[in-house]
Amino acid sequence: MTSTTLTPAVPAPDPAGAPADGSAQPPAVVFVHGMRTSGAIWERQVEHVRALGHDAVAVDLPAHGARAHERFTLDRSFEVLDEAAASFGPGRRVALVGLSLGGYTSLAWAARRPANLAGVVAAACTSDPKGKPVALYRDVARLVVVGGGAVGRGARWAARTSGAAWSAITRAGRSLPGGGASSHALAGPGDAGAAHRPAAPGWHVVTDALTQLAGRSWLAHVRDVDVPVWLVNGARDHMRLDEQRYLAAAADAALVVVPRAGHDVNSEAPEAFNRVLGRALADFGRGRGARLGA
């Protein structure tokens, strides 16, 4: 297990060589987005890995993007990943790259030890989403869903309660578990100002996702993963809270912290993230059982 802080001087090794398992092709890459975004957030990364010689696809999770009509569940999310992996053809090795909700989903899917999985890059997801702050946030989100956007005195109460939930989460040292930026999630579905969030899903996906996440231990999932795991965090992300525990739990892992980046590390520091991605894909090409960094 290794831990490092990324600096601009660190070059990315060329990952385009033949994988150690003898496959004629480098692993394909499946990108998995965070809460209330879509596969569109990965545009720069998809372009980057394709230039390195990897096939790639960025999926939309249930309740997001092209699957906005579906309810979010982990079981349905696993089906989406199954379909994406199978789309590259039988026997093709696949690497997962997930951010936040997508990172948690990727780790849980990888813990099932699917055939032909080469490795996982799990970004912004090293804090188990559990406890009273998360439950409070989920309950506030559910209230907004049931109320359909309360008005008058109810709206003011909801706003105050939302603020209390946010304060509790930040006091606990956490960003919104599973989501993109906590700030835009608290603002509701009408705040999609970022270019990569043209149509953010509504509050129902927050309640559904947090309900799904809160009942699991992602540390346990990390322990069950039998391929290399690269943990990538922005230095300013509160979700770094348990990164050392996640690093210690994994049988084969690396931790990279990107300076000056926050939760949405792939879009806040795309060049740095792409360098990390290149290094991770090169690592995934080595034979299982080799020492990390050897």
What do these predicted ranges mean?
Residues 21-66:
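Conserved HGGG/HGGXW glycine-rich cap/lid loop of the alpha/beta-hydrolase fold
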Residues 32-34, 99, 233-234:
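The conserved beta1-alpha1 loop
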Residues 98-102, 106:
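Gly/Ala-rich beta-loop-alpha elbow adjacent to hydrolase catalytic centers
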Residues 111-112, 117-152:
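Flexible "cap/lid" loop of the alpha/beta hydrolase fold
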Residues 175-220:
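Hydrophobic, aromatic-rich cap/lid helix
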Residues 228-261:
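Conserved loop-alpha-helix segment in the C-terminal half of the alpha/beta-hydrolase fold
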